[in-house]
Amino acid sequence: MEAAVAYYEATGKDKLLKVMEGMAGHIIDRFGPDKLPGIPGHQEVEIGLMRMYHATGNEAYKKHARYFLEERGKNPAFFAEEAAKRDWNHFGMVPKDIKYNQSHATIYEQEEAVGHSVRAVYMYTAMADLAATEHDEKLFAACERLWNNMTEKKMYITGGIGSTVEGEAFTKEYELPNDMAYAETCASIGLVFFAKQMLKMSKNGKYADAMERELYNGIISGMQLDGKRFFYVNPLEVNPGVSGEIFGYKHVIPERPGWYACACCPPNLVRMVTSLGRYAWDEDDDVIYSHLFIGQEARLKKADIKVVSEYPWKGHVSYSITPKTGDEFAVAIHIPGYLKSFEVTLNGMRLKENSETKADVFYSYRDGYIYIKNKWHDNDVIEISFNMDIRVIYANTKVREDIGCAALQRGPVVYAFEGVDNDDDVQSLMIDVSRLNEAQIQTEAEGILKGAVLLDIPAVRLESSDALYSEKPPRQKSVIARAIPYYMWGNRGLNQMRVWMHTIYN
């Protein structure tokens, strides 16, 4: 159904769409009240039905998406009962684990992100789409509870979700191991689906911030830079000889394979990258919303907008606006939550915030967006400028694996340290956060990392004797440690990698 809608939207041809209308009609005829009871084992049909509704306007599709969503959890034993009727079970399904498939409670009663992470965020996506479409405040509140729990207590700094290989699932709050992380690529993609639907209901910058975190880190890390190899799992620490080999770590493959049996992530990643325009913009009656600093030419209802972006390496983005009518409308641009200051200009003139400036044009700031209301003319240009400082990030101390450690970010990009840049050993490095002002920013001039911004960070390497245990503390050697964008790791052969680094304060 999703493919049929995508093809219809891209080409205007409805042949496949009509085929899938027949399929959707068959689903509606077979399942529902006074018919076969049932809910999807993997929550994708709900997304498909909602997309079919948006494409065709057929209310039956939306109504049945609601049925499937609201039926879940009414009988937590549904999948176990179904499995007992036959002598086989679908690969990967755990019928008796009612949290695995989010059937432990109704969608309105669920307080915590649990179970199979992809199933969960796909279900949340359909919930949020339905809530926004029908302006359902109760359903949106349920989505908001799940969003907050997931992003505030169960998400890696890279945007990865679903921390355990057991059931490809969420675990306990703050349980975010780095070297055993699962963080499936599809789960990160699903979180972007969810965020986009939440933005339809509430223009809050936290949803766009999450999309940005995923797109520059936890999603594109799933594909090798040449596009030929892929990760299913996205760890935050890798140690060859342990990762991929020892029990408990076998799922953490230290190099991207060419393919794998469950090949959901590669095509999902490709469709995400090729459909970024859907996630970058929204449009209401009197506002155009820009959620992401992505260079492109957008053809919208009120205007054509050309975006020229130097993001994420430099802090400069411009919007050239060609209005289609003479009406006054606002352009709302998301300002990333990490920015402490920024400058906005219109046709070279600096804009100030709020109307107290008595200027003809100004901007207002609300929930992570700047709003510029104007009667636009051809080739009016908005420019956003800001500094791109290196930021030291610390985890909540409830994340026990990260106590005493720090991670580095610049802009939206999370950084990682690889052995190939650091004498083959990142485990004995301690970055000196007190000397961060001495850090050097380098733009790689050649090779597979060409064009990327790399960081050279003052650090200390610990060196010990051969003894397993000793009363003598390790020797400290001052070094410069190099960090690369996390999404680029694993492109230069088998080696160590680490995001959260031990720190030293001099």
Task: Report the location of each language-model feature.
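Acidic/aromatic-lined carbohydrate-recognition and catalytic surfaces
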Residues: M1-A24, P33-E71
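Long, well-ordered core segments of solenoidal/helical folds
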Residues: K18-K35, H64-A80, M93-K96, C143-T158, ...
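Solvent-exposed loop and edge beta-strand segments that line ligand/cofactor-binding
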Residues: K13, D29-H42, N75, N89-T125, ...
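C-terminal beta-rich recognition modules with glycine/proline-rich loops and embedded aromatic residues
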Residues: A65, C143, D209-N217, G222-T322, ...
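Catalytic-core region of carbohydrate-active enzymes that cleave or remodel glycosidic bonds
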Residues: D129-K153, L176-K228, N239
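Proline-centered turn/helix-capping motifs that create local helix->coil transitions or kinks
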Residues: K15-L16, G57-Y61, G73-Y100, K138, ...
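Well-ordered alpha-helical scaffold segments within catalytic/enzyme domains
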Residues: M1-K13, E46-N58, Y122-E137, E175, ...
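Beta-strand-rich binding/interaction modules
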Residues: E328-M349
